[in-house]
């Protein structure tokens, strides 16, 4: 190890193949951080409180899901095979108005956290209502989260008076700043078409004042862009630029219908973009110009979006589909190599959420968010390289998960949650939805 002390480390993972190489290696964790990484052949004696044998496994950084509406697990499969506006207006918004409560957000976010942890996601950017309940669920589950309170210009769950929406978001951020080192509060405006100019400006200002990220859905559909041009004479990105809302702490989610000028504005302002390939495919919204975004060196993360438009939270599935989608569309198999996508789901996603430099790499001094993948799986055999994981990875191969040095999944069991209880609570809520729908 690179330091001379002999205090035991908290957790030592041994004999695993490291994502950075092929020889068996080890990772030592202390105080929530990676203390040392190296080859087994060169490992000094390291006393450890707990040791995990990762023989036959891959040790890799945890995945970062840059966009989710975790509590929407309740609406998984509720209204499938519909266009976005009809899906939202006729099904999702009415269901939210009736069934979203603090209890629902807590338990359904816990279910999402379990699904994410058990599929190798260690950090999530979430955006919803009653976000204090989501933040509590993430804290209890031990997942790292950027939890953003939703802002929208009509009566919303927990904020019946739209004029109070930004104040409610400010209060949420103040309540959660510094409460749990794994939870970063943030602010989410639903979109430029559901939030007026004053709301957008005030919400961004609240985020700037608190020093937290600002999220919003941008240019998800062709209809949204046409509407924006009609109302504002500008694309959604151009409109946000005119309002002074684009900077490196603004995260534009979806970015499906971006033109060259939009991408230039995003690049110039240093704004981040999150792509959600499966959600955009399912709702037939289109596909984001990911190769062009990367060519402009725009910061990009990958998200699943909410369960209701995916319908799972498995980021490995997202990676494979994201890679295949663009190759098929461009008729170019060299577009978006597998390793580049895995970067976006780890270190790229971390940077996108303002956690860059601290997360997403197997390096001493990084936050200890790790996943142990069982390579003794038919789909991962033989394992020539990391590409195999991108094209063949799945939740079922995730064996152990560590977040901030804490073991949260061990031998495919979530240690932080009573999963049968979580499932039972969500089923109870679903029975109400079924009876009322």
Positions of predicted regions on the chain:
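Active-site gating loops and adjacent loop-to-helix segments of metal-dependent hydrolytic enzymes
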Residues: 74-107, 144-166, 222-249, 269-272, ...
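His/Asp/Glu-enriched, well-ordered alpha-helical/loop segment
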Residues: 242-249, 291-377, 392-393
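Alpha-helical scaffold segments that flank or form the walls of functional sites
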Residues: 76-143, 165-179, 425-435
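Active-site microenvironment of metallo-dependent hydrolases
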Residues: 1-25, 29-35, 40, 46, ...
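Divalent metal-coordination and catalytic microenvironments
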Residues: 16, 27, 32, 56, ...
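Catalytic core of soluble alpha/beta enzymes
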Residues: 220-250, 255-268, 281-292, 306-317
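Metal-coordinating catalytic core of metallo-dependent amide/deamination hydrolases
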Residues: 133-256
């Amino acid at each position: 190890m690179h330091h001379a002390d002999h205090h035991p480390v908290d957790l030592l993972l041994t004999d695993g193949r490291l994502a950075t190489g092929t020889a068996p290696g080890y990772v030592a964790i202390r105080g929530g951080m990676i203390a040392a990484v190296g080859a087994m052949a060169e490992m000094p004696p390291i006393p450890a409180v707990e040791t995990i044998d990762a023989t036959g496994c891959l040790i890799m950084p945890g995945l970062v899901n840059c966009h989710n509406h975790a509590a929407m697990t309740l609406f998984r499969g509720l209204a499938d095979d519909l266009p976005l506006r009809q899906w939202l207006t006729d099904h999702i918004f009415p269901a939210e108005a009736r069934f979203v409560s603090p209890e629902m957000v807590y338990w359904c976010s816990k279910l999402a956290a379990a699904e994410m942890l058990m599929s190798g996601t260690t950090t999530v950017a979430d955006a919803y209502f009653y976000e204090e309940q989501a933040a509590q669920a993430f804290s209890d589950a031990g997942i790292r989260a950027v939890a953003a309170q939703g802002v929208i210009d009509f009566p919303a769950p927990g904020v019946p008076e739209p004029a109070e929406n930004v104040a409610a978001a400010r209060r949420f951020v103040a309540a959660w700043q510094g409460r749990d080192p794994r939870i970063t509060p943030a602010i989410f405006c639903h979109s430029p078409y559901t939030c007026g100019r004053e709301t957008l400006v005030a919400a961004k200002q609240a985020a700037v004042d608190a020093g937290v990220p600002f999220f919003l859905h941008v240019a998800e559909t062709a209809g949204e862009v046409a509407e924006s041009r009609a109302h504002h004479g500008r694309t959604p990105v151009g409109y946000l630029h005119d309002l002074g809302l684009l900077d490196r702490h603004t995260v534009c989610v979806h970015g499906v219908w971006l033109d060259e000028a939009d991408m230039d504005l995003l690049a110039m302002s240093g704004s981040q973009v999150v792509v959600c390939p499966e959600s955009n495919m399912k709702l037939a919204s289109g596909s984001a110009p990911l190769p062009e975004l990367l060519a402009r060196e725009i910061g990009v993360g990958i998200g699943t979006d909410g369960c209701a438009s995916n319908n799972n939270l498995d980021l490995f599935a997202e990676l494979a589909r994201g890679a295949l989608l663009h190759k098929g569309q461009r008729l170019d198999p060299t577009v978006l190599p597998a390793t580049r996508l895995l970067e976006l789901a780890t270190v790229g996603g971390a940077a996108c959420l303002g956690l860059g430099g601290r997360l997403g790499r197997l390096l001493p001094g990084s936050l200890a968010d790790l996943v142990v993948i069982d390579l003794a799986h038919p789909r991962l055999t033989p394992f020539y390289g990391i590409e195999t994981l991108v094209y063949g990875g799945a939740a079922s191969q995730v064996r152990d998960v560590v977040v901030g040095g804490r073991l949260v999944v061990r031998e495919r069991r979530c240690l932080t949650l009573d999963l049968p209880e979580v499932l039972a609570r969500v089923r109870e809520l679903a029975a109400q939805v079924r009876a009322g729908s």
